[in-house]
From Swiss-Prot:
GO CC annotations on file: cytoplasm; ribosome
Main location as per UniProt: cytoplasm
Classification via SUPFAM superfamilies: PRC-barrel domain, Translation proteins
Domain notes: The PRC barrel domain binds ribosomal protein uS19.
NCBIfam families: 16S_RimM (TIGR02273)
Subcellular locations according to the entry: Cytoplasm
Entry similarity comment: Belongs to the RimM family.
Name of the featured protein: Ribosome maturation factor RimM
Gene encoding the protein: rimM
Length: 198
């Protein structure tokens, strides 16, 4: 069975005719119209987005079978999922967040660092967050220089630790993940595609 990927979250009702605010986690917000039925995480409920239009930072959507405000309000907060195999294939150096989360992280020397916890973008580029077995998480630029290898088949990413981090003890690693400095500016960025964090 294909892994489920969260592609949208239903927000508050919009108007009195059953429309809802819909936050999507896809590169193209309107792509949710083309994925077919979307389900809850447990698969117990299925929804189809009949139509949608873009608003400020979300969509205003009509869900098939939802015809009044009361029905729309009952859906508030629901996350909507699609099987991974329904999503488009990625290009080289392009990855879905869900495919990266959980991968083992190790240094170029083969030392284990932990697991990929999340991919963030705070406006200055993509950041990979790695959770070590203990201690604070590492936040590193998700660039070709810092993450030279993404091995989805092998279930791992290889990390070239920036010079300012290498050799630091765990107590000083709180600021180690700062995307500033040479590592953030070096080489080209990778391109994780949002599809939900899961």
């Amino acid at each position: 069975m294909s892994k489920l990927i969260c592609v949208a979250k239903i927000g508050a009702a919009h108007g009195v005719r059953g429309e809802v605010r819909l936050w999507t986690f896809t590169e193209d917000p309107l792509a949710v119209l083309h994925y077919g039925p979307l389900t809850t995480k447990d698969g117990s409920r299925s929804f189809e987005v009949a139509k949608a239009r873009e608003a400020k930072d979300h969509l205003v959507a009509t869900i098939k079978g939802v015809t009044d405000r009361n029905a729309a309000e009952r859906l508030n907060g629901l996350e909507l999922y699609v099987p991974r195999d329904r999503l488009p294939e990625t290009d080289d150096d392009e990855y879905y967040h869900a495919d990266l989360i959980g991968l083992a992280a190790e240094t170029t020397a083969g030392a284990p660092l932990g697991r990929v916890l999340a991919i963030h973008n705070f406006g200055a580029g993509d950041i990979i967050e790695i959770a070590p077995p203990s201690g604070s998480t590492l936040m590193l630029p998700f660039t070709n220089a810092v993450v030279p290898t993404v091995d989805l088949a092998g279930g791992r990413v290889i990390i070239e630790l920036p010079a300012e981090i290498e050799g630091e003890d765990q107590d000083s690693s709180d600021n180690a993940g700062s995307p500033e400095g040479d590592a953030a500016a070096s080489n080209s960025a990778r391109h994780p595609r949002e599809s939900g964090d899961p």
